[in-house]
Amino acid sequence: MNTTGSAFVIGASGIGRACALAFARRGVSGLVVADVDLQAAESLAAECRAEAGSAGTADALGCAEATRVDVADERSVELAVSFARRVLGRVDYCVNSAGIGVKLANEIADASPVEFEAMFQVNVKGTFLVTRAVSALMKTQDPVPVLRDSPGRGTTRGCIVILGSAAAFAATPKMVQYTTAKHAVLGLTKSAALDNAAHGIRVNSVCPSWVDTPMVRRALQDVPELEQTIRTSVPMGRIALAEEVADAVMFLCSPGASYATGCNMILDGGTTLTTHLG
């Protein structure tokens, strides 16, 4: 099922980039991309316009604009959401993929309190601020039919998809800051889904394990033993493509997922299915 309506994507690289391009291909009526790096957001918006042209959806994509956001700053988030509302008129889909990865991999006895705090500022507080602001916006929007030829699906004011992690289900050695933050995001997703359900707003998360993104590539450079850990822990024998995660996000945004809220979709090539001994 295609996604119509307008989309607000936070995060201009990796999974966020893949989601924005997927929205452009699928014919959204408008798109706003936000990132702490405004130049990256502007570049992605231009790429989305070109992608819509190549996919034959340029007529549907009325606009693709960019703005800056620091998700850990309340005022910055409010300004970005206001920009999206002004440009798009309404936000039907919000995908929040902003986040940071581990820089210092240590056992808990040697873990950095500074990095722990930084991880929570972006990955937890940032997720909270974005979900809070977008929920408030969507509550003011008129409900629209989920699918006109299937009235039993009811109406919707919008949906939010948060990028979680398989680390919310299984811990990774020497990554206490990331594992703890992603467990918090899991709880936030469930709480937001419960609070928003009566307003016709769905909230879900996608929880991948290792994905081929710039953040993971940096982690592989910073933590030499990580590559072997990945190779031995993923039953499918490879890491995910960002496009594969975007496909899951598109499903959760689509009418096909109209009864899904509070879900935390694990997308990990089987990583969390078993323990790994030896």
Curated annotation (Swiss-Prot):
Catalytic class of the enzyme: oxidoreductase
The keyword Oxidoreductase is assigned to this record: yes
EC number: 1.1.1.-
Binding-site residues, NADP(+): 15, 70, 132, 178, 182, 211, 213
Signals that turn on the gene: Expression is increased in rice-extract medium (REM) and is correlated with the production of pyriculol.
SUPFAM superfamilies: NAD(P)-binding Rossmann-fold domains (SSF51735)
Keyword presence, Oxidoreductase: yes
Pfam family, one: adh_short_C2
Taxonomy, superkingdom: Eukaryota
An example molecular function term from Gene Ontology annotations: oxidoreductase activity
Keyword tags: NADP, Oxidoreductase
Active site: 178 (proton donor), 182 (lowers pka of active site tyr)
Pathway(s) this gene product operates in, as recorded in its UniProt entry: Polyketide biosynthesis
Function: Short-chain dehydrogenase; part of the gene cluster that mediates the biosynthesis of pyriculol and pyriculariol, two heptaketides that induce lesion formation upon application on rice leaves but are dispensable for pathogenicity. The highly reducing polyketide synthase synthesizes the heptaketide backbone of pyriculol and pyriculariol. Pyriculol and pyriculariol contain several hydroxyl moieties and double bonds, so it can be assumed that several reduction steps occur during biosynthesis.
Protein family per UniProt: Belongs to the short-chain dehydrogenases/reductases (SDR) family.
Protein name listed in UniProt: Short-chain dehydrogenase RED2
The encoding gene: RED2
